[in-house]
């Protein structure tokens, strides 16, 4: 499968590019970042886009991909209910295109969710504070 990464120079994008390059059944079709043209997705025959960009640009990226029948995986944080509603509307016109929204690919975020489920069984109330690296957008 031909997979492109948007936000390829960021922390998670860099990891995604490395994982795709290491997989025998995947081909990196494009590694795009801020300022790069999305046209490269169609020019390279991309089948799946993994988006690790920014909440302000993710919908434009998804619209381009879905309108070009490219499946999408979104790892961008800040994907709220409004964006989810927009995505559902967009996908309703493209029934053969799939989308996966997983805004927390980081191990720490996954562990935090697991810890919170466990803690909820034992505490009446608790607060969990999530922190990011210093350069997180």
Where are these regions (language model features)?
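NAD(P)-binding Rossmann-fold cofactor-contacting core
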Residues: 19-40
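Conserved anion/nucleotide-ligand pocket segment
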Residues: 111-137
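Rossmann-fold NAD(P)-binding glycine/threonine-rich loop
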Residues: 63, 76-99, 114-118
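Extreme N-terminal starter segment of soluble prokaryotic enzymes
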Residues: 1-3
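N-terminal Rossmann NAD(P)H-binding glycine-rich loop of SDR-like oxidoreductase domains
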Residues: 6-9, 13-17
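Rossmann-fold NAD(P) dinucleotide-binding segment
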Residues: 48, 56-75, 84
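Hydrophobic beta-strand scaffold residues
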Residues: 28, 72-73, 98-101
